[in-house]
Amino acid sequence: MGRLILEHTLQGHKGRIWGVAWHPKGNTFASCGEDKAIRIWSLSGNSWSTKTILSDGHKRTIREIRWSPCGQYLASASFDATTAIWSKSSGEFECNATLEGHENEVKSVSWSKSGGLLATCSRDKSVWIWEVAGDDEFECAAVLNPHTQDVKRVVWHPTKEILASASYDNTIKMFAESALDSDWDCTATLSSHTSTVWSIDFDADGERLVSCSDDTTLKIWRAYHPGNDAGVATPDKQTVWKCVCTLSGQHSRAIYDVSWCKLTGLIATACGDDGIRIFKESSDSKRDEPTFEQVTAEESAHEQDVNSVEWNPVMAGQLISCSDDGTIKIWKMLD
């Protein structure tokens, strides 16, 4: 069994904090929330402090922020129906582009591995894919409408230009660009959850996906490609995603976020019961029937709903969380 040790508790935002995002180098992170501001934090000695406050980009709550893979750009998704792109080209962070098109709140934003594509999703049920067309230029490459409800989260595959989205319609969708006509198509629908899918994350090589839901379960999905040795049929020679494991009974309320550590393979969850839980794949786990066990639970990690968790991409075992209680916490996972 492991233990989660609280290292730092940080305050600064007014109201609930919706999102936290580590910089690719792992030595800085950004946070966003109800106060319409983005804070960028860095470590000085042994303490974290706000280095920059960006407060002029949005008119309403900022729901999510994501750094580009190169670490030069920060994208923020807001309830004001826009996505802002920030960069430090002049030495100070400034908003260099505002992406408009969604009809309602933008819930999530994600950069592709190459940094050449950006995805956004909204309460308007659509997923948009944007091409980075040059300095501060973004062009809409696709507007995708396969979901029947609010889309909560978009996440790019860690190595390929494949996009996953999670929705209030209880499903996850996969998208890829067609080799024939360069159109973006929905290539798979992952159905097993019985309520809203709040968040998703790929494992390190992108062959598996974890999802978390309002139905209080976690699910692990595996990709089966055409010609796979497990005998899973792949109609139209498209990759099929199959639910290979369901984790239930550990969470008492909706699970709002999930993070699959690319360094350790540990899975962290953020829950509406104020808790953070850590899961590890069992040593005798089978490829097509994997088993995971809860290794630790911080039942009262925050005083209110935990909205977001993310493993540090560089420092193995370091986890960040944020909550409706207005705090950010940094944790260390010990074996």
Curated annotation (Swiss-Prot):
Keywords, in A-Z order: Repeat, WD repeat
InterPro entries for this protein: CIAO1/Cia1, G-protein_beta_WD-40_rep, WD40/YVTN_repeat-like_dom_sf, WD40_repeat_CS, WD40_repeat_dom_sf, WD40_rpt
WD repeat intervals: 12-51, 57-96, 101-140, 146-185, 192-231, 250-289, 301-335
Entry keyword Zinc: no
PROSITE patterns: WD_REPEATS_1 (PS00678), WD_REPEATS_2 (PS50082), WD_REPEATS_REGION (PS50294)
Gene3D superfamilies reported in the protein's UniProt record: YVTN repeat-like/Quinoprotein amine dehydrogenase
GO (cellular component) term, any one: metallochaperone complex
Highest taxon in the source lineage: Eukaryota
Record GO biological process: iron-sulfur cluster assembly; protein maturation
CDD domains in the record: WD40
PANTHER family: CYTOSOLIC IRON-SULFUR PROTEIN ASSEMBLY PROTEIN CIAO1-RELATED, WD40 PROTEIN CIAO1
Similarity section: Belongs to the WD repeat CIA1 family.
Record's function text: Essential component of the cytosolic iron-sulfur (Fe/S) protein assembly machinery. Required for the maturation of extramitochondrial Fe/S proteins.
UniProt-recorded name of the protein: Probable cytosolic iron-sulfur protein assembly protein Ciao1
Lineage of the organism: Eukaryota, Metazoa, Ecdysozoa, Arthropoda, Hexapoda
